[in-house]
C-alpha cells in the first residue's frame, strides 16, 4: 500500500546528521577528467561517493549487469546499482574551521544575534574577523571597566588585554636612546631627544641598530715600589691610590729584553720579551711616566719609568688580587688586573640581536644572528653587551619586582594578584600579568595583561552557542517580561520566542554553525557537454569548487603553521565561500560568473522567487499530453465543443490511438503502429476513423493564459478539424477573455477515467454558465450575436403622418393607401394609440406573421397584431421570430413566451436576463441549448442585416454649433469676472471645467436625440444602443466633440477638444489628446502587474478556506443594511438595487423576517426574488437591515460551513461541501483587477488637500490594511460635537458625560460634522479615508469588517464590476484571523505575541476548565501579505514570499505542516483537500437500495442486541464472520 504523507516537519540538521546523509567526503574541487570525461576520484562527481554513471556498471567496467547489484568493485570502489541514485545520494565537505549558516546570521532579526544578544553589525564583525568576542574575561579590566563575556574587542584592545598596554615610539636612524633597555620610565620622561613617553612602564628596545660589547681583559703584572710609600690593600678598585711618593722614584728593569709598550686610556703595561717570549710584565699606574720606547732593548737594572707624587689605579682598571713580597726597603707587587675594552658592531635590518641589554657573554657566544653566517657577530671574549640606537622604544605597562635569591616563576608564566614570584614568598605579584624574568638586573617584570579567552569567527560563536543554557535564559527573560518598560518587554519577547522555539523543537543552537557542508547529489547540479565540446555546468558546481579550494588551502596553511593574519584571512574567505553557496549576494557583492556579470545561482536562489523550486516546479509543472496553437472562432460548434486540429489530436491521444489501431488490426503491434504514425504520408483514412473513435466521449481542457479565474480552464469535447488552429466557441470567449487577433490556447488531456469524469462534470464549458464572482451569466450573447438579435427585435418608428387622429380604422388605412401616413407612424384611432401596421396586418397565429415576412408582405421590424394563446399581441414579426427561436431551443413554448419581453428590442442586458432566467427555470442543459440557438441566429441575422459602418454614419447634430457658441459667451464672462478680481484662479478653473462638462453633456444628448429621431437604424447608433460595441462616450467623440482632456499630471486641461473624430482634430487638439492616450497605455501595463500580484496575495491568504461542514451552528450573524447615508446630505437613502443584491443574494437568513405579509423563515437561502421582495419592503419602510449568516461570523476552523457561505453563485444553489471557496473569492476579486483604474486623483494643488487614492491602488491599500495617506480624523468616543476656531487652527471637541476629547485640525480641514452634531465612536469628523486600525480600536472588529467590504466594493462598483460581498468577506476574515495577547494569564503565551484567534479561544476554554486565569487579547488587523506569511503552514508561506525568512523561522521551531490548505498539498503532489479530493467526497460511498437495506437491518439488530437482558447476551455467541 502506498504510504500517504500526513505531516511534513522541517528542522535544523546537526553536523552528525549531515555526515550521516553523506556517502563520502568530497575532498577535491575537480569535476570530470577533460580527456576521459569520467568523474575524478574524490571530486564533485565521484562515482564512489554518488553512485555509477551507467546503470549497473562500475567505473572501471569490471562488473556489468544487474546480477552484481549491491556489489562494491574492489578495483574502483564503485557500488553496482542504478544510476538514478546520483539524484539522491549526497556527499559532504568537512570544513577546516566551522562556518556560520548565513540564513541564521542575516535573517531579520538575526537568529544567532537574538540568542546571543548581539546586534547584526556586531555578529558580522565577529564572523568576518574584524573583532574579537570575549568567551571568558578571566577578570580582565579595560579602561577601568571590567570586561564582560560576549563583549566585542578591537585588535588593539585585545592585544592590550592579552599582551599588556604598550606604546611604540620610533627613533630616527643614528639617534641613541636616553634610557636603557629594561629601564623603568614615567609618563612625560624623555626616552630620546624629542621623544617623550606617554605611559608609566618599562622601556624596551625594538631592533637596536648598534651593539657595544665591553670585553673583559685580564693581565698579571708586577710593580716594585718603595715600601714606605705603598698604600697597602688586598685589592684595588679603579682610581684608588697605590702609593704616595715623597720624592721622585725610578722603576728599573729586573730582566733584560725588548720593550713592548701597551698603553691604556690611563696607565700602561710594559712587557719585556726575549726571543718573542714574554719574560716579565710590568704595570705602570697613573703618575708613572715611561722612560723607554716600544722596541727598545734594555739591560737588567736600566730605568724603565719615573714616578712622582701620587700613584693611582687607572679609572677603567681594577686589581682583583694583590700579592706582595717585601725585599728590604722595597716591595714587589704582583697585581691581578681586570679592565674592559668596548667594541661596537652595526646591526643591519636583516640581522637580529639575540642577547638582552647588560647580558654577560663568553667567548664564542652568538650576539647577533644573520641569514648569512659570515655576517653573524660572535663574542671574542668574556664581556657585557650593551644595546644602542634602537629603531623604536616600546613602553610596556608593567610592574617591576627586584629579588635577591631564587625566582619561582619563569618567563611567559601568567600570574594573578597574590601569586609568589621570588625569594620564597617575599616577592608577590599585585596584578594580573605575564612574567618576564630579568636575571641581569635581578628583577621580575610582570607585564599587566590577562589570560583572556577572546576569539574571532564562527568558531567563537559556536562556542558561545554551545555554552548557552536555554532553560536558564528562558527564566531570565521571563523575569525581564515583568519590566515596566515596553521596549524592554518587546525585546525580551522576541528573544524568548527564539529560545522557546529551540527548547520546544529539540534543535541545538550550535547547529546554526556548520562543521560539514552537505553536497547536493550530482544529477541535481549536472554538467553537460554542449555543441563544440564545451561544458555547461550548474552554478552550484562553481560555488562548491570555490569552497573546496579555500577549505583545502586553509587545511594546508594550518598544517604549515602559517602566521595568524594569513590564517585569519583564509578563514574569512572560507566563511564567504559558504555564504555564497548558501545565499549568494546576501552579504557583500555576489560571486559572479567568470567572463560575465551574472551572479551565480546559489541554493537560496534555486528555492526562492518565481523561477525557484517552489513556484516553478512544485506549484506548477509542465505536463505531457499537452499542446498549444492559435485560436480561431468556431461558430458552428456547440457550447460544449471545441475544434481540435487533427495532427494535434493524433499526438495528444497517441497512446490511446496506438492501442485502438492494434485492436482494429490497422497495425500488427504497437511498434508498427508508432512507425506508421511517424511516417506522416502513410496515415490512412482508417487511422483517422480510429482517432475519431478514441476521442469519442472524451474531453480535453483548454486554457488561455493569463488564467485569472477558474473559468480560464474549461473542458470541451474535441471535434477533429482540418488546419492548424484550435476552434473556440464564441460564447466562452468572455470567460477566457479571448479574442481572435492571434491569441493562443493550450490543450491538455485528462488521462485517467476519474480525471475525464471530473473534467466532464465539473469543468465542461456548458456546465459553467454563471460567474462564480457575481452569479450572473458569463456565457451570454455578445457583439455580433446581440447585433443580429437586436436588429430583428427592433421596431420601426416612422414620422410621416405621426400624431394624426382618425375616427375609424378604415379611414386610417385609406390615408395610408394615399401615402399620407407611414405604416409604423404612431396615430390615434377613436382615441386609442395605434399604427396602420397594427390595423392592416392582423394574424391569427405567429406562423402566419412569419409567413408574411417570408413573402415580403411585412418586414421583421414592422409592428403588427398577432393572436396567440387567446391574447391579442401588438408586436413585430421579428420579436415573434425571436420568441419562436427561444421556444424551439428550450422545447417549451409556454415558458419561452413567459421568459421574453415582447415590448422591447433584445439588447445586451435583456438577453443576459433571458439566459439567467432560463438557467433558473430550465436548468443547465436547456440553457446551453438556448445559448447555441441565440448564437446561431444572432450570427445569421447580423450577417443578413448588412449592418456596416461608413464614415457618413457619424452624423454631427446641427445643435452642436449653437452649444459651442453659447459656451464661448459664458467663458468670456468667467474670464472677465476673473480679470476684475471677483474669482480666484482656482474658482475660475473650476467654473471653466464645469462649463465644458455641461456643454459636452448637452452635445452628447443632441447626438443621441438626432439618431433616435432621424436615423433609428444608423449602424453606429444600433451598435451602441444594443450593447454590441461602443458606448455613449465613444459615439460622442465620433459625432459630437471629444471634450476635456487630461494632463500628464492627472489634472485636466481647461481647453477642451472641440472637434469630433468625424470632423478631424487640429494639430493642437491632437497634441492635447496624446497625453491622456499615452497615460492610458502606461496605466494598463502597470495595472496588469499589480493586479496579478494582488491576486497572488489573495490566493495565498485564502487557499485553505474550503467548505468543510454543513453547519457550524453559530448564532452570530451580520446585518446587511438596506439604507446608507447620502454622500452630500448625510441623510439615509435606499442603497442601489445591485449593491443590495451583491450583499444578500444566495445568503442564509439568520433570523426570521416578515415583510409585506410574506414570512421568510430562518435558515432560508435568499433567492433573487426574495431579495427583490426585501427591496420592496425597504421602499415601503418595513425593514432597515437584513440579518444573514456570513463567512465573517462562521465558526468552522480552516474554512466555512455551507450555511455561512450560502449559494455557490456559479450554480445558483447551495454550495457543496469541499468547494474551494477561498480560491474562488481570491480569483473573483483579482480577475477584474485589470479593469480597475490606476488613478490617483490630484486635487490640483489645493493647500492641505492630499491626493485621493482610487482604483486598484485603493483596493491594494485596503487589503494590505495600510494607513491611508489622506487620513480622516475619527472620533474615539460617542458624544456631541463642539467646534472652536482660532487664527491658526480648528479644535473639534467631542463631549460625553464627564469626558471630553479634543482633536486639533489645520484651518483648511474639511469637516463632515457641525456644532451640536451627535457622533458615535469611529465616525469620521473630517473628509478622507478612514484608517482601519484606528477604526478597529475605536469601534471594534465588526465595524472594520463592514468598512473594508464597503470600501473595496466602492472601487469595483465605480468600474461597473459586479462582485458578491461574501468573496471580500472571506478575505477580510483572513485579515482578522489573528489576535495579540495583552495579558497571558496562566498560559505560556507572552504579552505581545500574535497568534490565531482559534488557538487562543481553545486555550482559554482549557484554562477556564482548569480554574486558571484565561488569556486576554485584542483583535488585530493584518494585511493579506502579512497574514499569508503568518500562516501555520510553512510550506505555503515559504512558497509565497520571503522564502529564506519563513524557512529559517520554521526550521528553528521544528515546525510541522499539517497539510490543511491547498498549496502545501499541491507542493507534495497529493490530492488537494477540496472538491473531489476532500475527505468528505473521497470517503463518501454511493450505495444502492440493496446495500441500504442490509445496513438498516444490521443497525436494527445492533439496537435489539443492546436491549436484550445481560444474562442472555452472555450465553449467545456471535457466529464468526457474520458482522453487521
Swiss-Prot record:
Cofactor: Mg(2+); Zn(2+)
Protein name: DNA-directed RNA polymerase subunit beta'
Function comment: DNA-dependent RNA polymerase catalyzes the transcription of DNA into RNA using the four ribonucleoside triphosphates as substrates.
GO biological process entries: DNA-templated transcription
Enzyme Commission number(s) of this protein: 2.7.7.6
Similarity remark: Belongs to the RNA polymerase beta' chain family.
Gene behind the chain: rpoC
Domain of life per record: Bacteria
Class in the EC hierarchy, top level: transferase
HAMAP family tied to this protein: RNApol_bact_RpoC (MF_01322)
MF annotations from Gene Ontology: DNA binding; DNA-directed RNA polymerase activity; magnesium ion binding; zinc ion binding
Organism (species): Thermus thermophilus (strain ATCC 27634 / DSM 579 / HB8)
An example Gene Ontology CC term for this record: DNA-directed RNA polymerase complex
Residues bound to Zn(2+) 1: 58, 60, 73, 76
